[in-house]
């Protein structure tokens, strides 16, 4: 294998929404992923897996890539990479990208993946929330029963950080507006949505 591809990580790492590997063909993307595994570079590998997700690759291919990446580079994988294949991930990014806050503050909009596999149909749902805590902290609070939504406490699988990275540290009023509008937009797109109030 040629080691001609440059490392992806830099001082200003790109957001997953920017899709820095979008221009790569399938072979070059596979080569970049193999190199990331060889270097135990979780960030570069995460961008490769993310690109597979956004291209709607075969679910088994994405699950296999996730497993290999976690095995080789667990300590350096960014928190925006989901831990499992999520069929609606491209839709989440596209929908969340339509929302922006103009005023800065300390409130964060976040998404939680919910497990609805026991209900038949789509195995996943989403919870849309807003908090002054980081999304990961707020998820932990939900799971611990602290001011928690029952659906997150019982069915919450993980925080989906990537789609809402640009919706962090917003003014409270803007975050509340975006929370409600994002929940409505995801529901209109056909997803099972909780929260958004």
Model feature map: region roles:
Residues 2-133, 137, 177-178:
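GIY-YIG nuclease catalytic motif and its immediate N-terminal context
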Residues 93, 99-126, 132-197:
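Structure-specific nucleic-acid interaction/processing domains
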């Amino acid at each position: 294998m040629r080691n001609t591809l440059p490392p992806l990580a830099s001082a200003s790492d790109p957001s997953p929404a920017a899709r820095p590997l979008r221009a790569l063909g399938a072979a070059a993307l596979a080569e970049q992923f193999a190199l990331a595994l060889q270097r135990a570079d979780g960030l570069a590998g995460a961008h490769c897996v993310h690109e597979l997700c956004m291209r709607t690759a075969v679910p088994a291919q994405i699950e296999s890539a996730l497993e290999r990446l976690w095995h080789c580079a667990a300590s350096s994988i960014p928190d925006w990479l989901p831990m499992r294949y999520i069929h609606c991930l491209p839709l989440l990014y596209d929908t969340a990208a339509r929302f922006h806050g103009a005023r800065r503050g300390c409130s964060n909009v976040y998404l939680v993946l919910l497990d609805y596999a026991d209900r038949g149909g789509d195995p996943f749902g989403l919870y849309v929330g807003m908090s002054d805590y980081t999304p990961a902290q707020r998820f932990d609070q939900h799971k611990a029963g602290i001011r928690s939504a029952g659906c997150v406490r019982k069915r919450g699988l993980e925080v989906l950080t990537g789609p809402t990275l640009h919706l962090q540290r917003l003014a409270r009023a803007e975050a509340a507006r975006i929370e409600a509008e994002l929940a409505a937009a995801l529901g209109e797109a056909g997803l099972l949505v909780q929260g958004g109030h």
